[in-house]
UniProtKB/Swiss-Prot annotation:
It comes from Rickettsia conorii (strain ATCC VR-613 / Malish 7). This is Ferrochelatase. Catalyzes the ferrous insertion into protoporphyrin IX. Fe cation binds at H188, E268. InterPro entries: Ferrochelatase, Ferrochelatase_AS, Ferrochelatase_C, Ferrochelatase_N.
Length: 342
């Protein structure tokens, strides 16, 4: 019997206008994966943060048209992926988008999936490196809202996927023409306590960067992994991207910034990297080049397509695997979705 496949793309979401900034912030900070506290304390904290940060966040979003570009970017990725898959598979399929903290929410998407009436569902996060705060939260929320009994295949991560690495390399090589450049691979930060609790995010970031550096094959390449978007007084992953730009400026080192954990343009890249961090480089009069996110880059879309083809062809159902069909995280990372290796 011919398969009928529902493919769900996960991403963070974002406000569609300035009025929706506050509810977006509340949804974000009310997530137990972000603030792991019991209610009503978590609810109160999320309310306070969403109220106190609303004006500042509105000002930031006003710099990029008063809304997040993430949904539009994801729609474009969905279209590119649909066109590519149509060329390669005979099965019926439909691609759905599920945002975690803004519409389309899981409940709405599941309603659409039920009308489509698939024989199986494949979950594909647009987070290449796994974290319990991103993919983990999205998958958990989707499954909690799912009220039909259906085979599900979950792709937890793809930090070492061949064409994913090649896509990054191709974009970097377009700009890497001077030996004086220092490459900063900038990833979204996480509190240290989340990593210490067994989250494999920083491990997978390192794996991705090492694979890119190996593929670039440049002797004595000057590069660092850095983390951006810190919030609050707690300890976050280090080094901080801002601090490393300052350091490079003092050394008169020109910079190439690679947004290594983002596959779509949104506020962290368009404002934080393109405006705020560039001002630091301008202060020191060093060259500052920002590599674009992968978006609808053909090599990246090929990467996602190849991952989906692998999972479509798997006979096993109710799978949770990395794109390589194995657990890539050492067993110490207990938050990894994949089964522990023996």
């Amino acid at each position: 019997m011919k398969k009928r496949i529902a493919i769900v793309l996960f991403n963070l979401g974002g406000p569609k206008n300035l009025k929706s900034v506050k509810p977006f912030l509340f949804n974000l900070f009310y997530d137990k994966a972000i603030i792991n506290l019991p209610n009503p304390l978590r609810y109160i904290i999320a309310k306070i943060i969403s109220i106190t940060r609303e004006k500042k966040s509105q000002k930031i979003y006003s710099l990029i048209g008063g809304k997040s570009s993430l949904l539009q970017e994801t729609e474009e990725q969905k279209l590119a992926l649909t066109e590519k898959l149509k060329q390669l598979i005979k099965e019926d399929f439909a691609i759905f988008i599920n945002m975690r903290y803004s519409a389309p929410f899981a409940k709405e998407v599941i309603g659409q999936i039920k009308k489509y009436n698939p024989s199986e569902i494949i979950l594909l996060p647009l987070y290449s490196q796994f974290s319990s705060t991103t993919t983990g939260s999205s998958v958990k929320n989707f499954l909690q809202n799912l009220d039909i009994d259906i085979p599900i295949k979950t792709i937890c991560c793809y930090p070492l996927e061949k064409d994913f690495i090649k896509a990054h390399v191709s974009l970097i090589k377009e700009k890497l023409y001077d030996k004086n450049f220092r490459i900063l691979f900038s990833a979204h930060g996480l509190p240290e306590k989340i990593i210490k609790a067994g989250d494999p995010y920083s491990f997978q970031i390192k794996e991705t960067v090492q694979a890119i550096v190996k593929e670039l094959n440049i002797k004595d390449l000057d590069y660092k992994i850095t983390y951006q978007s810190r919030v609050g007084p707690i300890e976050w992953l280090k080094p901080n991207t801002e601090d490393e730009i300052e350091l490079a400026g003092k050394l008169k080192k020109d910079i190439i910034i690679v947004p290594i954990s983002f596959v779509s343009e949104h506020v962290e890249t368009l404002v934080e990297l393109d405006i705020e961090y560039k001002l630091i480089a301008d202060k020191y009069e060093i060259q500052y080049i920002r590599i674009p996110t992968l978006g609808t880059n053909k090599i990246f879309i090929n990467s996602l397509t190849n991952i989906l083809l692998r999972f479509i062809n798997k006979v096993d159902t109710n799978l949770v695997m990395s794109s390589s069909s194995t657990r890539i995280c050492p067993n110490e990372f207990t938050k990894c979705l994949c089964k522990l290796t023996s």
